[in-house]
Amino acid sequence: MQTLTTPQFQSVPQTHNAFVAIDNVSKIYPTANGDFTVLDGVNLTVNEGEFVCVIGHSGCGKSTLLNMVSGFTQPTSGQVRLKGKPITSPGPDRMVVFQNYSLLPWKTAFDNVYLAVNSVYPTKSKAEKLDIVRQHLAMVGLEDAAHKKPGQLSGGMKQRVSIARALSIYPDVLILDEPFGALDAITREELQDELVKIWEEHKLTVMMIT
C-alpha cells in the first residue's frame, strides 16, 4: 500500500505509462475576491493493483483530486488519464464509494447492487446478474442481509452495500472518498481490514482519501 500526504504531490515524477496518471494538474476556482487555487501542478501516478491513500487536512484539495479522477470535474490545466486515455466524464470504469452511502432507501441491499449491475451489463442474462450480486454481497459478509432496506442496516452494513455495489461492476479503479468518516472507531477498523483483504485477494486498483 502506498501512502502520500498532500505536500508530496509535486515530487512524484510524471509517468506517461501509468495506469492512472495525473500530470501537472491545477484547479482554480473564481471567487468574488479573485481566483482561488485548490491544486497547483500536481503530479501523481498509480500503477495497476496499487492501493494509494491520499492524506491531508480538510480543504487541502483531496476530494477535488479524486473528483477529477472520477470525472466529476475537470482540471483548469494539466491532464488526468486512465490507461492512457484522458478522463473527461464519469464512467463505470471508475466507481466511487462516498462517506454518505448513497443508497436508494426504498430498495433492498440486493436491489441496490442489482441496479448497478443491470445498468452496466444489460446484455447479461438475469441469472448471471443475480449471481454477480450474490457473490459481491457475500464478499462483504452481507448475504444474510440482502433482503433488508438501508433503514434496517447499521452504518457499517450500509457502507458494505456501497462497496459491494461499486465492486460488482468490476471497475478499473475503486475510488474511496473518506468512506469510513461516518463510522464509529470499531466498525471503521473492521471495514478497513476487510477492504485491505478484498484488495489483496482481487488485485484491485484503489485510490482513497482520508
Feature locations, PLM:
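Conserved ABC transporter NBD signature motif
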Residues: 78-90
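Conserved signature/switch motifs of ABC ATPase nucleotide-binding domains
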Residues: 148-151, 169
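Short helical segment in ABC ATPase nucleotide-binding domains corresponding to the A-loop/adjacent helical element
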Residues: 110-118, 130
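The feature captures the beta-strand-to-loop junction immediately N-terminal to the Walker
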Residues: 55-57
